[in-house]
UniProtKB/Swiss-Prot annotation:
Degrades acetylated xylans by cleaving acetyl side groups from the hetero-xylan backbone. The keyword Disulfide bond applies. This is Acetylxylan esterase. The modification Pyrrolidone carboxylic acid is found at Q32. It comes from Hypocrea jecorina (Trichoderma reesei). Monomer.
Amino acid sequence: MPSVKETLTLLLSQAFLATGSPVDGETVVKRQCPAIHVFGARETTVSQGYGSSATVVNLVIQAHPGTTSEAIVYPACGGQASCGGISYANSVVNGTNAAAAAINNFHNSCPDTQLVLVGYSQGAQIFDNALCGGGDPGEGITNTAVPLTAGAVSAVKAAIFMGDPRNIHGLPYNVGTCTTQGFDARPAGFVCPSASKIKSYCDAADPYCCTGNDPNVHQGYGQEYGQQALAFINSQLSSGGSQPPGGGPTSTSRPTSTRTGSSPGPTQTHWGQCGGQGWTGPTQCESGTTCQVISQWYSQCL
């Protein structure tokens, strides 16, 4: 299986044969990388895909033509038979690792791309763990280090958490009416080193990120706060982050918020997911790329 370097070498060789002139390898890499890439992570029991994070993911794609996106592949389970009976704790551990691996790997391949994270419920929790560190002892994560590399943290320009079980009142990035905490709350006084990049949405009636009793509230953040989240994301992206219509790589399909995973097409595009436990999308990569295993939960076309 060829590495990214070997693939690049092949591309450079083809370019030289076609033009008769040497080609700058760094230029080729930059042309293949999007200006903005969005990671989405779904809520518990939802089939592989974006789940309810799709609302904000789509808003970013529509606002910034050329933006690409991918959904984190992880169990998103809480012990239910529909998702394989995997415990919530194991799902969070696997999801946190999968999120960190996907983000770190993408940044290594595209160091100049601006990254946006959009997580919903358990999906917010795994991004919270990956970006902020601090461990998650309630779910079995005792290592308090931030699992993202320093470069990847710098590349993450905005993170949107909706219905995050790690919510606790008083965090500087909280938005909404909740004045208590979620069922797996951060400890009092917790400080996230990337606080300025985050907005976390939670209302008082939510039984998961707060202490309410209305599950419908938990599912409504995209509609209630989607435009507000987009405005924050736009403010965080650099002025040169967006590409004009028709410029740069584009997402082959818009994510949907349905309860079933969506397939980007018969073959996956460069940087897209192509495998991992629970993945139901395409496993063949477009010409010039191969499906490389990053973790048990995530493989990528490189």
